[in-house]
Amino acid sequence: MMLLEEPGALMASPEPVAADPTRRERVVVAVVAVAVVGIYVAIAAAHGALGASRNDDWAYIRIVKDLADTGEFRLDGWVAAMFLGQALVSLPVMALFGQGILPLQMMVAVFAAVGLWATYAVVRPWLDRRWTALSVACLAAGPVYGIVAVSYMTDVPSYALQMITLLVGIRAMRSAPVHLGWLAGALGFGIASFSMREFGVASGAVVAVYAVAQAWAGRQRLRPVLALVGAWSVGVMALYFWRSNLPNTWPMVVDVSPGGLGSAANSIWRSALTIGLLASPVAFAVSPVRLLRAMGQRLTRRAQVVLLLLAITALATIPFHGLGLIGNHADRELAYWGTLPGDPPSLLPTPVWVLVLLVALYSTAVSVGLVALRVEAVLRRRRSWRSGLASTADRGAHLVVSFVVLYAALLVATVVITPTELFDRYLLVLVPLSAALLARAGRAEQVMRSLPGRREWAALLALATLGVAAIDASAAFDGAKWRLGEVVEARTGWDPGSIDAGYEWYGYHQTAPVERQGFLTAPNFWRLLFAPRPVCATGSFAPSDQSAVPADDVIATVVERSLFGVEVRLVATPGPDDCP
């Protein structure tokens, strides 16, 4: 119970300037959140990506359309996420606006704005207004959120509901005894988040455990709290086992082989670097000299040896030659570049990419140092968990610390035990909350300034520049792929399902069920998701030497340029099958 014992110490602030957001502040944040998401939507619309299938959109849309038409929730063998909750929320949207892609993407955009607003509301009661804004901006300005916010992926809706779960849960815990109505609401939102993505269970679990601990410590309303938590637990388990036993469920495989563990370690390291990069505007506020001095003075010899061994192990085992981020969105190339064969254009030149990695390394190292200092502070105090719960009003920070630890532990356990591949979109919830906790911890250790200054806002501007470049280039790529398929269809009259204009186009236009044909190997792995059928045209990145593809062999060429000059040039050629 040590985690529950001292999260207050972990978050203690020498300058208690945090407060609940005022009504005006809430309205301003809501307006800003809507404006930010509006920019994401405008960028996608400018390149034709709004209303086009993006990444796994096609697979989710096939399921929800089938649900709307038949009333049955049937999996296709490709979707691994829980998805049920998002499908149910989508039904009224489809009833009002039709079964097109655009209404569903706009629904997710609404979730994106709500998620930013809720995150601010979660952090603000225990952090200064400026640090809160900077922490949320680390996610909003980065290269990940703006891409998945204009899609039909489950990541953003699950993120938004997890933030709402924490927000309502904090409201329940701040009253003494625990407010049963708010607790029931928080657990309900927790189940809703879990019903979209399995990792969403973390928010409800943290609220449930903390509610029981608080009721036990105060010896008030323990039985009704246990009843609510028990009902939540039964609901989560019933939903999980029901979903796991549906036909065409993605198989769960256990892999603890040396190769699997090595891959897991690489994924964990890359994920840490990705979070470090996105939280770097806060990390730059930390004085490295003060941090090193504090670590030398306050850490025990044992802790210093552990950190030294950790650094040596990292240097000895991490393949720095291939060092990078976890990928999928924040990458040197275009987001989802593997969804079309050929050589994609680079988003960032080599010197800029090296600088990005150095920033990520620095920020991650600073974060590790701060975590070590705060853990040491927790261990020094050694107060009982009962007194810790009873003596502090900083329960929002308690929940957030516990949530971040649990969510990260779930990610680590999943990637260690199973061959699940991590992507940066799985880290959404960790970015703003980790940044906020770093700000709080840095001020508690007196190794950073009390308020963000020019350096931190300049770092945020640099992150936003990287974010806009990635979001814009991704929209250009997705829009170009979709337009390539449309042009080929218009010029040839071929069935759209016989045109391979990339992963999204091909999957969306198939009418046959998913029938995986062995190992999915690139390029064009998406064809192996379905039974063999004639493919009349194939899209790809245009080769740098345009003479490599004779003009007579080109059915269509689509060129899209991003705001920062990245040129996406795609070509479609006949075949591999002959079609009339």
What are these regions (language model features)?
Residues 11, 15, 67, 124-130, ...:
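Membrane-interface transmembrane helices that cradle and orient dolichyl/undecaprenyl
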Residues 169, 334-348, 421, 456-541:
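Membrane-embedded, lumen/periplasm-facing catalytic core of multi-pass transferases
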